[in-house]
């Protein structure tokens, strides 16, 4: 099933998202080989940069947030942002962005077919699609990189419970 707006997904970051990624694999070639073998049979995590973000827009949709917008906009309509962390972690510079944008102004970006635009719920502290707009995918993530949908949070313990996935584009 393809990710929908509002879904919280786990995905493998594209090259631009991986500049700070450091492999957890051992530098010892024997241990590294064992880790790879265990990963192949799902007994160890894969050696990739898996990230968690909320889907905001899907292929063919236009996403943006400009001065005066009441929220992040998809196809010219504001999305529901009730799930966004408030108060924000960091202040927003009003000369370059807004609270409703969760940081700097951006877009418009047309999401390529087969890709998704993702944003963190902690908008002012999230290096999400907005911070990768100069890469070959314009900050979007190929749906093929999605590993699954987040259903439950175990940690931190003060957030343990199910994950809401509201239709953030509902009018």
PLM segments and residue spans:
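Soluble "head" domains of membrane/secretory-pathway proteins
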Residues: 1-171
